[in-house]
Amino acid sequence: MDKIVINGGNRLTGEVNVEGAKNAVLPVLTASLLASEGHSKLVNVPELSDVETINNVLSTLNANVEYDKDKNAVKVDATKTLNEEAPYEYVSKMRASILVMGPLLARLGHAIVALPGGCAIGTRPIEQHIKGFEALGADIHLENGNIYANAKDGLKGAHIHLDFPSVGATQNIIMAASLASGKSIIENVAKEPEIVDLANYINEMGGKITGAGTDTITIHGVEKLYGVEHAIIPDRIEAGTLLIAGAITRGDIFVRGAIKEHMASLIYKLEEMGVDLEYYEEGIRVTANGDLNPVDVKTLPHPGFPTDMQSQMMALLLTANGHKVITETVFENRFMHVAEFRRMNANISVEGRSAKIEGKSHLQGAQVKATDLRAAAALILAGLVAEGTTQVTELKHLDRGYVNLHGKLKSLGANIERVNR
């Protein structure tokens, strides 16, 4: 098993590139199943274990998948008759595998998908997915760890109001409705940039989707969708992680590919703390010096502060003066990294859904383990400024969402290595 070893204290400087977005490429790959004519080519695809997993899922469904890692490109040909079942072997590894259900229902009228896996942060229920499919005319039942869906009369447009703006449910319902007969209106939808990217992709394939990025999405179903070439948007969570790497080390970094409009809530908090940010068409420059101001953070659905940046922001707040409170409203079990920060001498207490940070912590190197994907990055960030040596284990989480993070940080001046232990 690998571990990352960091000797803290180096100020990071230089330029770094952002990969394609993990949270965009996974739904776009599954949406490629919608194309019954021609093949799709996706570019700017990050080399992640989750991409490998979803490619394997698509292959089991009888799609032909070619992954060129050297060119960060994936070709998907889904023109053959698709298999209806996404097996537990792959789906159990990653929650996003549930996203094949919408395309399978749209193409075949029936699907069997194992209940999903992924990071252990909260229950993340699938009720909203099921609600949407049922509204579109599918019969759903759960049996022996599988979700069985059947729309014997085909999917039909519907008016759907989500109880919560679930990202996955929004994506799944969009894909199912894109080939349904008639018009669908989905209210209280997720508004993340990744939703917009998915809608843009389906529209490029011949779909008719409007309103992505707003509270209400309207879909006019079409009879057929076609394979196209599509570039995945930059990863705003990786970009945010790298901005914090610059801020936490009081460094000077240009993050090429960072898009201001995709991370407005994070940028607002960084500026409130006294971090200097400069915006260019090609990316964002981050510089920081001296003491940072205390701020409170509350995670919310987009455009609120992203839960996927909560643990990285916690690492930064450990280096700021004063009293700080982080409130997690999206997932109920996303403070598992607090115990690991405490091993590094962090002064944090947790009360329910809030974590309280008192003063500036004198972080010390320790052996810590990643508890989920973003916590892995956060512990590495803390290690960049901790006194002494930090060792981060359980890197399987990190590899699900970051490409060569240690290498990028090393190129900026960090004393960091990935070693086989």
Swiss-Prot record:
| Cellular compartment(s) | Cytoplasm
Pathway info = Cell wall biogenesis; peptidoglycan biosynthesis
What EC number(s) would the UniProt record show?
2.5.1.7
Q: Name one GO biological process term.
A: peptidoglycan biosynthetic process
- InterPro entries associated with the record: Enolpyruvate_Tfrase_dom (IPR001986), Enolpyruvate_Tfrase_sf (IPR036968), MurA_subfamily (IPR050068), RNA3'P_cycl/enolpyr_Trfase_a/b (IPR013792), UDP_GlcNAc_COvinyl_MurA (IPR005750)
Q: Which UniProt keywords apply?
A: Cell cycle, Cell division, Cell shape, Cell wall biogenesis/degradation, Cytoplasm, Peptidoglycan synthesis, Pyruvate, Transferase
MF terms in GO = UDP-N-acetylglucosamine 1-carboxyvinyltransferase activity
Main localization, broad class: cytoplasm
The function of this protein is: Cell wall formation. Adds enolpyruvyl to UDP-N-acetylglucosamine.
Family, similarity comment: Belongs to the EPSP synthase family. MurA subfamily.
- The molecule here is called UDP-N-acetylglucosamine 1-carboxyvinyltransferase 1
- The organism encoding this protein is Staphylococcus epidermidis (strain ATCC 35984 / DSM 28319 / BCRC 17069 / CCUG 31568 / BM 3577 / RP62A)
Lineage start = Bacteria, Bacillati, Bacillota, Bacilli, Bacillales
